[in-house]
UniProtKB/Swiss-Prot annotation:
GO biological process terms on file: 'de novo' cotranslational protein folding; cell division; chaperone-mediated protein folding; protein transport; protein unfolding
GO CC terms in record: cytoplasm
Primary subcellular site in the record, as a coarse category: cytoplasm
Organism per entry: Legionella pneumophila (strain Corby)
NCBIfam families: tig
Pfam families: FKBP_C, Trigger_C, Trigger_N
Protein's name in the database: Trigger factor
Domain PPIase FKBP-type residues, every copy: 161-246
Job of this protein: Involved in protein export. Acts as a chaperone by maintaining the newly synthesized protein in an open conformation. Functions as a peptidyl-prolyl cis-trans isomerase.
Length: 459
């Protein structure tokens, strides 16, 4: 067997394999003889079919079978000998075997990048630290009161804080636009859930007295056809409701399963939950900062095949989040634009390659004590912690998920050892509800929803 390897563009390689005709013919003849012993053909007794008849009828199909199997065996051998690790499925051609000629084929594929990890070497990395304050707890209590308002209908003009039920229709240049209308839509004025100016334009409105408002979509709005454009909305208020905040008493505390201790017990419970979530978020953000720092000093060429595969995973994840179930074979997945997922896919592939190499270099293995400690930590947030522990321990897949999280923490800790750390204090709200750096994620989600709605309406 002869093998040649040609470097194409980037990580792409072209492997040419040539198998001697003698080996091919020997394998084809062997299979035809074996077939002759058991094949049934009208006019001949089983096992008595002349070889030439078998060869005439089955030679082409047997050669195709031999070609497929030879590609599998010889390509694997060629990759092993040349230390090539494909990043995706090879594109192989041709697969035909011509009688009397060497079997020659080519395989084109991307290889996994070969690189050495560059350490941070005391490069500065800014991490964050935060804690839950009394003010944070009080703010959370007020949010819970807002969420538990008792609403009653009123007849006065709309004011900020009221809840309205509206019908509306949006127009661009006097023409209705897709996704710009709704009936019986509930909206709390001042919630900021609509585009700027929309909610303010409803203030002062009255029941069953239609009016128009003009608003402009933000320049960075997710739907490109609407971004930066001025729209007119025709609005009719069907109902106005005023909210009354519940009193801070034992009855309020009981709504959150507080049996004893009233509001003070509720505050304690809220503080513990907030602290747990804050710790989780801070750890996640710091881990991401450490990973980003490692990525910034390790520029790796990324295989397109891996990026494409990750994009497909992200598409299915998006489908699951929006429709609440996994994609089924008979269901149509909307044709999401590639750019919706490309940046995130590239980051995942980059980080995955670095992670694997870093673990190998530093011989990092998931510590059993840390795995069990993480399971205990998860379990502590549940009413029946033993059941959750049993669930994780019931399958290798569940345990593997925890082991992967532990490995991430161990890698992050190792990166931190090699960095010059400094800390920035952030308040609870800034950590849990970041205002900057999330616009793009929100825009992507908005685009996805708009696309899906368009597809569903088109169908």
């Amino acid at each position: 067997m002869q093998v040649s390897v040609e470097t194409l563009e980037g990580l792409e390689r072209k492997v040419t394999v040539s198998v001697p005709t003698e080996k091919v013919e020997e394998e084809v003849s062997s299979r035809l003889r074996n077939l002759a012993r058991k094949v049934k053909i009208d006019g001949f007794r089983p096992g008595k079919v002349p070889f030439n008849v078998v060869k005439s009828r089955f030679s082409d199909s047997v050669r195709e079978e031999v070609a497929r199997e030879m590609v599998q065996s010889t390509l694997y051998e060629a990759l092993q000998k040349n230390e090539l690790v494909p990043a995706g499925y090879p594109h192989v051609e041709p697969l035909e075997i011509e009688p009397g000629k060497d079997f020659k084929y080519t395989a084109v594929f991307e290889v996994m990048p070969v690189f050495e990890i560059v350490e941070l070497n005391q490069a500065p990395v800014e991490l964050i630290q935060s804690e839950v304050t009394d003010k944070d707890v009080d703010n959370m209590i007020e949010k819970l009161r807002e969420q538990n308002k008792e609403w009653h209908e009123v007849t006065h003009a709309v004011k900020k804080g009221d809840k309205v039920v509206i019908d509306f229709q949006g127009f661009l240049d006097d023409k209705p636009f897709q996704g710009g209308s709704a009936e019986g839509y509930e909206l709390v004025i001042g919630s900021g859930s609509m585009i700027p100016g929309f909610e303010d334009g409803i203030v002062g409105g009255k029941i069953d007295k239609p009016f128009d408002i003009k608003v402009s979509f933000p320049e960075d709005y997710g739907h490109k056809d609407l971004a930066g454009k001025e729209a007119t909305f025709k609005i009719t208020i069907k109902k106005i409701m005023e909210g009354k905040l519940p009193a801070l008493d034992e009855a309020f505390a009981e709504k959150f399963n507080i049996k004893e201790g009233g509001i003070e017990s509720l505050k304690k419970d809220i503080r513990e939950n907030m602290a747990r979530e804050l710790e989780r978020r801070v750890n996640m953000m710091n881990r991401e900062k450490l990973f980003d720092s490692l990525m910034s000093v390790n520029h790796v060429e990324l295989p397109i095949a891996l990026i494409d595969k990750e994009i497909e995973h992200l598409k299915h994840d998006m489908y699951h989040r929006l429709f609440g179930h996994e994609h089924k074979d008979d269901e149509k997945i909307p044709d999401f634009p590639r750019e919706l997922f490309e940046e995130q896919a590239k980051r995942r592939v980059h980080l995955g390659l670095l992670f694997a190499e870093y673990v190998k270099k530093h011989e990092i293995v998931a510590d059993n004590d840390k795995v069990n400690a993480m399971i205990d930590k998860f379990a502590s947030a549940y009413e029946s912690p033993d059941e959750l522990r049993a669930w994780y321990q019931s399958s290798k897949e569940h345990m593997a998920e925890v082991e992967a999280l532990v490995m991430e923490d161990m890698v992050a800790d190792k990166i931190a050892e090699d960095a010059k750390l400094k800390y920035k204090n952030m308040d609870y709200d800034s950590v849990m509800n970041p205002k900057k750096g999330t616009e793009k994620k929100g825009e992507l989600a908005c685009q996805a929803i708009q696309i899906i709605l368009s597809v569903m309406q088109a169908d």
